[in-house]
From Swiss-Prot:
ADP-ribosylation drastically reduces cytotoxic and antibacterial activities, and enhances IL8 production. Phosphorylation at Tyr-85 has been found in some cancer cell lines, and interferes with ADP-ribosylation. It is found in: Secreted. Residues 20-38 form a propeptide. One of its GO terms (molecular function) is pore-forming activity. GO terms for biological process: antibacterial humoral response; antimicrobial humoral immune response mediated by antimicrobial peptide; cellular response to lipopolysaccharide; chemotaxis; defense response to fungus; defense response to Gram-negative bacterium; defense response to Gram-positive bacterium; defense response to protozoan. One of its GO terms (cellular component) is Golgi lumen. Disulfide bonds join C66-C94, C68-C83, C73-C93. It comes from Homo sapiens (Human). Keywords: ADP-ribosylation, Antibiotic, Antimicrobial, Antiviral defense, Defensin, Disulfide bond, Fungicide, Host-virus interaction, Phosphoprotein, Secreted, Signal. Residues 1-19 form the signal peptide. It holds the Pfam family Defensin_1. This is Neutrophil defensin 1. The modification ADP-ribosylarginine is found at R78, R88.
Length: 94
């Protein structure tokens, strides 16, 4: 029974240690000023494209679908750059 209590205490300390950086980051994001363009106040998307990573064959872009994802691209996609949306960095995946 004592071992179970010790393991539970270690688990709670580990969870609390991980939660503190998340709370600090959430506070930083909330404190950051909104980056909203005057002409389009709803959405601001900034893309950084690395041309050296782009597909070389013109036909290969025909059916390419790209998305901004957090935290990383899913299986079968490749990261081609970075998106900035609502002050957060997203992976630009195709």
């Amino acid at each position: 029974m004592r071992t179970l209590a010790i393991l539970a205490a270690i688990l709670l300390v580990a969870l609390q240690a991980q939660a503190e950086p998340l709370q600090a980051r959430a506070d930083e994001v909330a404190a950051a000023p909104e980056q909203i363009a005057a002409d389009i106040p709803e959405v601001v998307v900034s893309l950084a494209w690395d041309e050296s990573l782009a597909p070389k064959h013109p036909g290969s872009r025909k059916n390419m679908a790209c998305y901004c994802r957090i935290p990383a691209c899913i299986a079968g996609e490749r990261r081609y750059g970075t998106c900035i949306y609502q002050g957060r960095l997203w992976a630009f995946c195709c």
